[in-house]
């Protein structure tokens, strides 16, 4: 039997949009964060070379050590020292976000989310038994999206474990600042 938290999740509206646009040449496929461009040749060639070398087995759990070292060096150069041991490479962004949610949230914890937002960001906490409180963006007089910061802060409680602020925001394009 499927858990109630899963059964009660709303159907994905993004999937509805994608289904309506799939196969249409006059529509750009932005619904899944995809480009309308084919993957560049150097990346396709590197993938083919990797397959030809027989690199088809499971990798290290946290990602290839040399990739984690490169990411750590890049992050260190941008910000502050980051050890490769603190880096985990995932197969996709949604996997990384779910791992983060699993590390931070338990049943009864609270998430305060700026909405509208990509539906997976609010579905993940719900799957884990956390409560999601939504704080809406609203258009100002010029039609630009704005966040009511006092309203956001008023929603934070001692049970709040995660503050979800997606910027640049999907789907509005709103940015912090």
Predicted regions and their residues:
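N-terminal small-domain helix-loop-helix segment of the aminotransferase-like
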Residues: 7-92, 99
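CheY-like receiver
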Residues: 20, 100, 151-155
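Conserved PLP-anchoring active-site segment centered on the Schiff-base-forming lysine
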Residues: 86, 103-125
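Short beta->alpha connector loops at strand-helix junctions that form conserved
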Residues: 115, 134-139
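A short helix-loop-beta submotif of the ANL/AMP-binding
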Residues: 127-133
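Active-site phosphate-binding strand-loop segment of PLP-dependent enzymes
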Residues: 137-177
């Amino acid at each position: 039997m499927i858990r109630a938290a899963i059964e009660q999740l709303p159907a994905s509206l993004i999937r509805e949009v994608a289904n309506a646009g799939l196969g249409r040449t006059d529509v750009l496929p932005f619904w899944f964060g995809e480009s309308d461009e084919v993957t560049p040749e150097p990346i396709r060639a590197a993938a083919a070379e990797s397959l030809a070398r027989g690199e088809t087995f499971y990798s290290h759990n946290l990602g290839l050590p040399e990739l984690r070292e490169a990411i750590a060096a890049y992050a260190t150069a941008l910000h502050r020292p980051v050890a490769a041991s603190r880096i985990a490479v995932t197969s996709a962004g949604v996997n990384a976000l779910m791992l983060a949610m699993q590390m931070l949230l338990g049943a009864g914890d609270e998430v305060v989310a700026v909405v509208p937002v990509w539906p997976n960001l609010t579905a993940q906490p719900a799957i884990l038994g956390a409560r999601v409180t939504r704080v809406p963006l609203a258009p100002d007089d010029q039609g630009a999206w704005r966040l009511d910061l006092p309203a956001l802060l008023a929603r934070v409680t001692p049970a709040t474990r995660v503050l979800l602020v997606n910027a640049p925001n999907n789907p509005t394009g709103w940015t912090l600042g």
